[in-house]
């Protein structure tokens, strides 16, 4: 760049910063403009790895969708528990009016510190969400679910009235406001969504999600969760075999997937994943039905090995750290990197 252009650019940047504030515009390579983001674990080690950054990104819009009883709310409650363990403040916008606090506690959620709202209509739910995001004090907000964000006009109208596109317009307008505020506040907004069928589709999948197309565009991460089988103890079904596909990912390569077990009343079988992935990278030895770590045998069969790791959490954490270092290139399981200092200061201030 010649001197005249460089001077003109410098003057323009100075004018922009004077008018709109420091760090409004910067070079992408600057240390202060780092793109590394804080992450929150999903509760599933395999899914954290499939996401490519070690968890769900803060400051972004995230969508998780799937059929009924596939584990959507379970996954989000586990993410809330992980966020709280990092010292974060979380909120749950329960538009379906179906949150079970007893089950949430079983999954590790501190219900005393969890903010809960059960709004009357979609406008109220999204306005509450935006106000919480702009406060700068919330780390994670879950909206359960998009399908239950019923527009006020539909609630006040008659049962047979037609309200074409109302919910889609509501979501589009709300996301335009929330997305920028979420980035500035470093607050993750996680939408749970349901599946509907499109009529008359001859080719391709007839499935679609509710609430229009806006959420598909604004979401940095979209996950499709499905129940693919049952986990049995003898003849008794004790859980679901679950598969999650990362359909969209702006943080890492998309289309990866993870399979894991969700045990009823307990959540993801995290230690079973630690053993499987430990064997995959060579951190855990397997000879016949015996599993070993270093020179120590940890159990015969996966069930006994899980019990051993449950009784020896330090060994489980050590194996998990090795898995994350191998798969993600990081030894810290709580975050990939910190947000730059300027952004932290900005996130601490309420967004006007």
UniProtKB/Swiss-Prot annotation:
Coiled coil stretches, renumbered: none
Region ranges (Disordered): 330-352
Disulphide linkage map: none
Record keyword Cytoplasm present: yes
InterPro entries linked to this entry: AAA+_ATPase, DNA_recomb/repair_RecA, DNA_recomb/repair_RecA_CS, P-loop_NTPase, RecA-like_C, RecA-like_N, RecA_ATP-bd, RecA_C_sf
Function: Can catalyze the hydrolysis of ATP in the presence of single-stranded DNA, the ATP-dependent uptake of single-stranded DNA by duplex DNA, and the ATP-dependent hybridization of homologous single-stranded DNAs. It interacts with LexA causing its activation and leading to its autocatalytic cleavage.
Protein name as catalogued: Protein RecA
Lineage summary: Bacteria, Pseudomonadati, Pseudomonadota, Gammaproteobacteria, Moraxellales
């Amino acid at each position: 760049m010649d001197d005249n252009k460089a001077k003109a650019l410098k003057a323009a940047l100075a004018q922009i910063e004077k008018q709109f504030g420091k760090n409004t515009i910067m070079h992408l390579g600057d240390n202060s403009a780092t793109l590394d983001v804080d992450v929150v674990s999903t509760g599933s080690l395999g899914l954290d790895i499939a996401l490519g950054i070690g968890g769900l990104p803060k400051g972004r819009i995230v969508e998780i969708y799937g059929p009924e009883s596939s584990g959507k709310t379970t996954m989000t409650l586990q993410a809330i528990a992980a966020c709280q363990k990092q010292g974060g403040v979380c909120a749950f916008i329960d538009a379906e009016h179906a949150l079970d606090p007893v089950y949430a506690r079983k999954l590790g959620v501190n219900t005393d510190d969890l903010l809960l709202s059960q709004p009357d209509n979609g406008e109220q739910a999204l306005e509450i969400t935006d106000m919480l995001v702009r406060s700068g004090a919330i780390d994670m907000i879950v909206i359960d679910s998009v399908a239950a964000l019923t527009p006020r006009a539909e609630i006040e109208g008659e049962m047979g009235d037609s309200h074409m596109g109302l919910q889609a317009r509501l979501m589009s307008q709300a996301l335009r406001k929330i997305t920028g505020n979420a980035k500035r506040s470093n607050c993750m907004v996680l939408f749970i969504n349901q599946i509907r069928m499109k009529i008359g589709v001859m080719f391709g999948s007839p499935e679609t999600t509710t609430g229009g197309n806006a959420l598909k565009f604004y979401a940095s991460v979209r996950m499709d969760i499905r129940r693919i089988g049952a986990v049995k103890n003898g003849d008794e079904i004790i859980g679901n075999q679950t598969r999650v596909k990362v359909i969209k990912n702006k943080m890492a390569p998309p289309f990866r997937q993870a399979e894991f077990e969700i045990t009823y009343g307990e959540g993801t079988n995290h230690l079973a994943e630690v053993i499987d992935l430990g064997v995959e990278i060579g951190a855990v030895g397997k000879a016949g039905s015996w599993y070993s770590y270093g020179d120590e045998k940890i159990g015969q069969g996966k069930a006994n090995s899980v019990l051993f790791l449950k009784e020896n959490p330090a060994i489980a954490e050590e194996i998990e750290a090795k898995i994350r270092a191998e798969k993600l290139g990081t030894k810290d399981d709580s975050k990939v990197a910190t947000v730059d200092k300027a952004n932290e200061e900005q996130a601490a201030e309420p967004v006007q």
